[in-house]
Amino acid sequence: MITAVRTGQSAPGKHSHAAEFVKELATYLKSKHGIDVTVKTQIGGPVGRICMISNYENLAEYEKAWNKIHADPEFHKITQKASGIMNPGHTHDTLWRSA
């Protein structure tokens, strides 16, 4: 099992807008690509951090899913909404495997 975690940082004063944006993106990924995404906000540590968590059977499934997503023009259109509400350059992707 592979768990993908994408963490981003909301712009100052935009945390609630950023959380709504990430939830919209998660809803789209489920409806269009069948990917279950959990959205979490950090409650300790740096303020304004938001993450999306999704699970895949293996790395090949992860790569197949994200290649399809990155080829989706509607996905790119939705991500443009992040401008002004997410801090650019503060996105961090990690992949985890079951022990």
Give, region by region, the residue ranges found by the protein language model.
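Short S/T/G/P-rich N-terminal loop/turn motif that feeds into the first structured element of a domain
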Residues: 1-76, 81-99
